[in-house]
């Protein structure tokens, strides 16, 4: 499918699920222009209709599943085709009829898969039980969020405890008086109801939780500023409480500096069941088209003590680093990289430079260790264009990608973007 910004999650038996943002330009001619504005268009939101320029199978954001360690992939359970448009379509197609823009996926301790798909104005929830093989949600279950959302982050744990961070991009009036671009929503009934009103003070953020334990972590920029620090907020009681000034959330802990303001360079947090938690982020001390740095912070005691160091691998742009951790403390890192020294071109960020996917894994890293990164896909993800060189545009691979480690820690899967 044509899409970008993929998210990936894995169940305890190795079933994997990917969602990706759909490119609306591939929705068909004039899509999604309402019929009243374009009489020769039978309606908006076209999906896989003969003679139209589209790869869409359905209206929801992409949702793919693999039940054989990633060897083969297909659409997730109950995500059948919805050919046509919003006026003439298959309304018996299940979850795929719920129009979406982009989403996120998480898995709880019961191996229930939770897929959130945002419509920007609100969100749909899709729940799949039995390692993600059985769709169990009523069609188009609406979340009823209080604020518009541009990017959802989801973490699940226990039996139906769900944490959702919504990027509202602003601080709308809310109940606790906190201010922040992200809002936190909490559910303990599998997403049927959510708490409201809680903004998370700070800048760009991500969230992770233990599946079987009680710990939840939010990594964030301390503020929406050019430079500052990366902080971690911790709850050891499933994120319960009435806000970030009380309840079970501790005060933010500084884990490292931020230098420059990388495009969508938010910190990514992940953890395991044994008390290890790590954060990775990109820094841009030389501007968006100069050499970037990757910083990494890790704690082996539930976030009490931290070690932080620079783990940069190339002289170039190191974008959107992502971290995964096994229960045996195998730590994988991956990033999109553009090496200024590998092409013999005249200049750094210039037309013809190639982006590649880099990945590596390290057992129980300590301060000063280096990952032996390799190019994971020999095919370039993207080649810099003349326009991108002239405008300093480094956004060709969009905002992020994700990885997972297998349950036994012997392999890891990467959901990433490759431009056509």
Residue spans of the language-model regions?
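Extracellular, repeat-based ectodomains that mediate carbohydrate processing or recognition
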Residues: 1-420
